[in-house]
Amino acid sequence: VWPLPQTVQMWLEYELLKNPTVPGYFCVSTSYRNEPNPVPGRHNLIFPMFEFEMKGGMDELIEMEQELLIHLGYDASKFIKGKYLDVAKEYGTKELENDHETKLYEEKTPSFFLTDFPEFTSPFWNMKRNDDPTLETANKIDVILSGQETIGSAEREVDRTIMVDRFKAIMNGAYKDKMYELFGEERTMAEMEEFLKFDFIKRSGGGIGVTRLIRSMKLEGLM
């Protein structure tokens, strides 16, 4: 067990950085989520996950996701994109919850692309933030299909210093403290240095909850 690659995402990112001439990598794995307050029909403890890493930033990422959905039969004319803070303001809340995802489905569309997540949602340490620092948002896209977040994706950071600083700061330092507790500071930071040796290219990646995707496709009459 290694400190940083606690999900397949880090391994895929490692492979892409190691072999930058390859357009991207993907795999299907089993994911385990210990949700503190699981909602029946929404949260599964164990589920299949399709994960991918690819070249390109936010524009290329959302283009790929839309092409995937079109290939699966989703209606492109119903695709709607909205920024997190704008949607939260519309629903009179600071933080979007499960009920808001359901409302997006019932009131707007079966295919909503939620973008630009604010810092208080604790975006991961290797997610790129908006080039405008005053916005304090991450280049993150959640694709809400039929009322449930089904694809979680983001553009990756390329600045080494920023990645180290964020690794130590996210969740007010709790993530870093947990890694140190489990694996030790020396081992954790040695692995970080190994990761940071690469020449970082513009890249993105994400995970698709296969169970939720199948659920949505059935609801939309696509399978």
Sequence positions of predicted segments:
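A translation/RNA-centric and nucleic-acid-associated enzymatic feature enriched
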Residues: 1-56, 63, 81-223
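Flexible helix-coil linker/hinge segments at domain or subdomain boundaries
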Residues: 71-82
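Short amphipathic C-terminal alpha-helix that caps PH/PH-like domains
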Residues: 62-73
